[in-house]
């Protein structure tokens, strides 16, 4: 049972939904009992993080195991497109329903969204994974022997490409998530947006992410790779370019904090989402390709390692971003400039991520590596037995 992904996905979704309802409850509780509200919020958001990590990483592992090598990048693209579409739709709809704001309205909406998420997930998982014996494409004779997890982890970490990609995932997700929790307060304080308007702004950002993912998927397909003979279909180009463009969009938010109400904040946020989507889907497609490279059948271990790096960075980035904005606002009187300092630091992280992505060495396809290994073995055997080459 522990080797199956479905129980982990269902459990993660259940924990996530419970955490969402508790977070809304904590928000209402803050007005009456601040200390108890903060304590409940701490546990609620911890549950959200655990739920997202457990379900999201398990989905990636299931994808890596069930989908053939040459289709993994496209499958990961579809999965992430659906995820971002769900985020954009939920943010847009709940943003409209939240106005006029009240604690009771927030709690009802959170409960409804959580129930819908659990029900849709359960329906989607029906007969998706199949029997445990059908998960691996390899037969029982060719399947890799089971090894201790720590040994498999050390083996994967010793691979240069896996190690480089893990560091890239951590830094890029740190930059991505650091603005996640402060963008809405920034819009509310500097631009006087209502809670409903800030939620809709988040939906606009996710719509940009969706567009960026579609654009990257088209460019990395036949259309992009053949257009004028240029390298528009390269995942590395889109990953590095998306990180650089995301840094520029964050510099735009620095300018937004300095200029204030007349700045086109919605267009800037949409562009930030567009560039985030382009780099993230290219990185995800690269991840699914890299999952099959290296020694042995370690797709699950590699994806788990990268998923853990993403989860740790996402939680750490949100915490650091929120703490940095509070610290900056404590020392800087102008809130727009205070938030701008944090956005500027996040732009620097994206520049570092772009450099890391550029240095990741491309790996040969596993089938090509196997063919090379087979040819070398055949030559060696012919030499040993003095057989003539065919």
Regions found by a protein language model. Name each.
Residues 17, 105-124, 336-358:
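Symmetry-related core transmembrane helices of the 12-TM Major Facilitator Superfamily/SLC fold
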Residues 46, 157-179:
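Pair of pore-lining "gating" transmembrane helices in MFS-fold secondary transporters
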Residues 132-166, 190, 367-390:
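Juxtamembrane intracellular "pre-TM" segments in multi-pass secondary transporters
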Residues 235-283:
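C-terminal transmembrane helical hairpin of 12-TM major facilitator-type secondary transporters
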